[in-house]
Amino acid sequence: MNTVIMILVVMTIIGLIFGLVLAYVNKRFAMEVNPLVDLVEDVLPKGQCGGCGFAGCKAYAEAVVLDESVPPNLCVPGKAAVAEQVAKLTGKSAPPIEPRVAHVRCGGDCTKAVKNFEYEGIHDCVAANLLEGGPKACKYGCLGFGTCVKSCPFGAMAMGSNGLPIIDTDICTGCGTCVSACPKQVLGFRPVGSKVMVNCNSKNKGGAVRKACSVGCLGCGLCAKNCPNDAIKVENNLAVVDQSICASCSEATCLAKCPTGAIKAIVSGTDLQQQSKNEAAANS
């Protein structure tokens, strides 16, 4: 019994000694925390998306407060409102931000894209891509397993019934998480005011594209030749729309001239279910 009591006393003394040592170390080597960091972090949306280039909101708050070279407008989800608040707190100037949203640069859904084989592995785009680039004949197209949807920290994406992801542009913050998650680089950004986009990501020549997908861009250049604003160019066998020039002419010349319908008018909406119907109709 005495031995047990002695052990308890010794352990208690050791615990007290360690506690005192830790308290001293904590006080002696404590780093001063700038209260402004917490104030800046409080105005950030807490999406932890990393779109700012830092490892989360706390890291960005520390950087923008402590480093003069870090601008106050890097929080993409926060947009102009958050940029203005951060600028006010830090005494920095916030240049204007062009609002952007993510866009799926592929129209090759399960009814239009040719498959080379049936994939029965892990339901994940990264995993499927490891097997010969995925089951689709087009190695630039969306694999349709929803890795981007799962990665979205704001719930702005859903998988459509046609096997392509749908983006709710009223929820999308343009943070870029889905863009980074896609192994095919199918997802990209577009300005919020965009009117038309090329729903194709293939760099293959027209003949190969036609064999792999019925709605792929052939790189024929008809859209570029007929655009009254000279806003379209063909680069690497793919039509590219310069959104700073495109005025979405009332005739919608590029849409009418595209032989495969790869160029589409932008579809936006707040309800993902309704947008799914709109996307299906637009791709039909």
Curated annotation (Swiss-Prot):
Annotated positions binding [4Fe-4S] cluster 4: 217, 220, 223, 227
Binding site for [4Fe-4S] cluster 2: 138, 142, 148, 182
EC number: 7.1.1.-
GO molecular function, one term: electron transfer activity
Subcellular compartments: Cell membrane
Amino-acid positions noted as binding [4Fe-4S] cluster 1 in the UniProt annotation, renumbered to this chain: 49, 52, 57, 75
Cellular component GO terms held in the UniProt record: plasma membrane
Region (Hydrophobic): 1-26
Sites where the protein binds [4Fe-4S] cluster 5: 246, 249, 254, 258
Record domain 4Fe-4S: where: 32-92
All copies of domain 4Fe-4S ferredoxin-type, residue ranges: 133-162, 163-192, 206-237, 239-269
UniProt-listed Gene3D superfamilies: 3.30.70.20, Electron transport complex subunit B, putative Fe-S cluster
Example GO biological process: electron transport chain
Entry keywords, A to Z: 4Fe-4S, Cell membrane, Electron transport, Iron, Iron-sulfur, Membrane, Metal-binding, NAD, Repeat, Translocase, Transport
HAMAP family: RsxB_RnfB
Protein family per UniProt: Belongs to the 4Fe4S bacterial-type ferredoxin family. RnfB subfamily.
PANTHER family, per database record: ION-TRANSLOCATING OXIDOREDUCTASE COMPLEX SUBUNIT B
Quaternary structure and interacting proteins, as annotated: The complex is composed of six subunits: RnfA, RnfB, RnfC, RnfD, RnfE and RnfG.
Protein name from the UniProt record: Proton-translocating ferredoxin:NAD(+) oxidoreductase complex subunit B
Species of the source: Clostridium ljungdahlii (strain ATCC 55383 / DSM 13528 / PETC)
The encoding gene: rnfB
